[in-house]
Swiss-Prot record:
Bilayer-crossing regions: none
Protein name stated in the entry: ATP-dependent Clp protease ATP-binding subunit ClpX
PROSITE patterns noted in UniProt: CLPX_ZB
Subunit: Component of the ClpX-ClpP complex. Forms a hexameric ring that, in the presence of ATP, binds to fourteen ClpP subunits assembled into a disk-like structure with a central cavity, resembling the structure of eukaryotic proteasomes.
Pfam families attached to this UniProt entry: AAA_2, ClpB_D2-small, zf-C4_ClpX
Organism for this UniProt entry: Ruegeria pomeroyi (strain ATCC 700808 / DSM 15171 / DSS-3) (Silicibacter pomeroyi)
UniProt entry keywords in alphabetical sequence: ATP-binding, Chaperone, Metal-binding, Nucleotide-binding, Zinc
Gene name linked to the record: clpX
Gene3D superfamilies tied to this protein: 1.10.8.60, ClpX chaperone, C4-type zinc finger domain, P-loop containing nucleotide triphosphate hydrolases
Residues engaged in binding ATP: 120-127
């Protein structure tokens, strides 16, 4: 086994798979006629792990177990264990319900349980849905509620959601009727005032009304090419009874409604009298009641068709540091790859990672704000680096995050000097 150490270039060994030399990797493992580096071994392990998970995802009756679904979600989404469990059970029951419906002679009809995901911005709602799309064996589509309008007005009809599901199933109607739909930004279609309005609200309450029958179960007429319906056009008939709907939204301001309701009931010596700003948004969301959603602007019929409620928490400092470093597509790994293309190593100190997480918490943008902070820190370095020679390493320390100081640049000459001095 060769380790990363200096030596004669004539005796330099190279990985037979990626071509990197023994000086560019931590370990180089030798076979009879070939060599493999530690990075290629890790890549092979990831490939085998994915294959094993996909083959063992289903239990004996063909239904993925909630624990299996949750384990796969854990690989990509940090934290949010409660929301993962709710989603895993809901998807598992969706599969079981479909299998139960196919069995003849059953007197009990299992109703579906659509899901509402509520959490502050950047906490992982959309990522959970995208990860589900990768691991499920049913057609899956995501729709943006902000683009929807009532039928007859400029914008997308709600039937376009089903069209996207049909496209995901390659126009196989039977498969589409067993699919899952995720509607994002559902908090943006709330009615504009708490009282019913005389004027039509075509992008708010009107969309909620249009989604009601679709979510409950109806036969939707879908134009195969999309667009508006024309009398001459043939429609595809899609039964939405067995389609699972997951709705998600940040619901900005809902925490204030919950806190206001809590103030009215806080009396006596044992009452919790902490100010609402002392409690996180995620903590307040755990006390959510249907009446809060009605006050926010959802109509009662819409809330009634979303019986399963999962609230996501604010991400704390440890979770944000983990998001920066651990997932397969972690931000730190992405920027390290960018710097590798300039033949430069990028390193972050532990204190720097914690400082980045603190800045994201102060901005209240969750994990979504991490990239803008990283761009801000590395902007000048990325601007100057392509024009500089002999820079082998860039180190981001705490000062580079908390002040105007630049990341430390280590030059090849300095490394040689320290090596000879040693």
């Amino acid at each position: 086994m060769a380790t990363n150490s200096g030596g004669d270039s004539k005796n330099t060994l190279y990985c037979s798979f990626c071509g990197k030399s023994q000086h560019e990797v931590r370990k180089l493992i030798a076979g009879p006629t070939v060599f493999i580096c530690d990075e290629c071994v890790e890549l092979c392990m990831d490939i085998i792990r994915e294959e094993t998970k996909s083959s063992s995802l289903k239990s004996s009756d063909g239904v993925p177990t909630p624990r299996d679904i949750c384990d796969v979600l854990d690989d990509y989404v940090i934290g949010q264990s409660t929301a993962k469990r709710v989603l895993s059970v809901a998807v598992h029951n969706h599969y079981k319900r479909l299998n139960h419906a196919q069995k003849a002679g059953s007197d009990i009809e299992l109703a579906k349980s659509n899901i509402l995901l509520i959490g502050p911005t950047g906490c992982g709602k959309t990522l959970l849905a995208q990860t589900l799309a990768r691991i499920l064996d049913v057609p899956f589509t995501m729709a943006d509620a902000t683009t929807l309008t009532e039928a007859g007005y400029v914008g997308e009809d709600v039937e376009n959601i089903i069209l996207k599901l049909l496209q995901a199933s390659e126009y196989n109607v039977e498969r589409a009727q067993r699919g899952i739909v995720y509607i994002d930004e559902v908090d943006k279609i709330t009615r504009k005032s708490e009282n019913p309005s005389i004027t039509r609200d075509v992008s708010g309450e009107g969309v909620q009304q249009a989604l009601l029958k679709l979510m409950e179960g109806t036969v939707a007429s879908v134009p195969p090419q999309g667009g508006r319906k024309h009398p001459q056009q043939e429609f595809l008939q899609v039964d939405t009874t067995n389609i699972l709907f997951i709705c998600g939204g940040a619901f900005a301001g809902l925490d204030k409604i919950i806190a206001q309701r809590g103030k009215g009931s806080a009396m006596g010596f044992g009452a919790d009298v902490r100010a609402s700003d002392e409690r996180g948004v995620g903590e307040l969301f755990t006390e959510l009641e249907p009446e809060d959603l009605l006050k926010f602007g959802l109509i009662p019929e819409f809330v009634g068709r979303l019986p399963v409620l999962a609230t996501l928490e604010d991400l704390d400092e440890d979770a944000l540091v983990t998001i920066l470093t651990k997932p397969k597509n972690a931000l730190v790994k992405q920027y390290q790859r960018l710097f590798e293309l300039e033949d430069t190593e990028l390193d972050f100190t532990d204190d720097a990672l914690k400082a980045i997480a603190k800045r994201a918490i102060e901005r209240k943008t969750g994990a979504r704000g991490l990239r803008s902070i990283m761009e801000d820190i590395l902007l000048d370095t990325m601007f100057d680096l392509p024009s500089m020679d002999n820079v082998t390493k860039v180190v981001v320390n705490e000062e580079a995050v908390t002040s105007d100081a630049q990341p430390l640049l280590i030059y090849a000459d300095a490394e040689k000097g320290s090596a000879s001095a040693g």
